[in-house]
Amino acid sequence: MTKNIEPRHYDVIVAPVVTEKATLASEHNKVLFKVAAKATKPQIKEAIEKLFDVKVKSVNTLVRKGKTKVFRGNLGSQSNTKRAIVTLEEGHRIDVTTGL
């Protein structure tokens, strides 16, 4: 596979999600990423395939609603975040502990 990495691919993928649930999902060839709020599934798939040189089987997305917090007596809210659950083809793996 050719690696035609473009700067926009780095704008789509914000960071890998390293949680207990994400670690359990990695046993089933799934990797979780925090992605840009306006990123679409085809953009996420293309970015993952180019950046990590793997084949993506499917992409599922979800939006986590921001929490309401009190800071110095003022009510505020955290931003919503978008996550992508990327299912990889058999034989392909991504080690999220290494850098891009």
Swiss-Prot record:
GO (cellular component) term, any one: cytosolic large ribosomal subunit
Cite the Gene3D superfamilies for this sequence. Answer: 3.30.70.330
Q: Which domain of life is it from?
A: Bacteria
Q: Which InterPro entries match?
A: Nucleotide-bd_a/b_plait_sf (IPR012677), Ribosomal_uL23-like (IPR013025), Ribosomal_uL23/eL15/eS24_sf (IPR012678), Ribosomal_uL23_CS (IPR001014)
Question: What role does this protein play?
Answer: One of the early assembly proteins it binds 23S rRNA. One of the proteins that surrounds the polypeptide exit tunnel on the outside of the ribosome. Forms the main docking site for trigger factor binding to the ribosome.
Record-stated family:
Belongs to the universal ribosomal protein uL23 family.
- What is the protein named? Large ribosomal subunit protein uL23
- Name the gene behind this protein: rplW
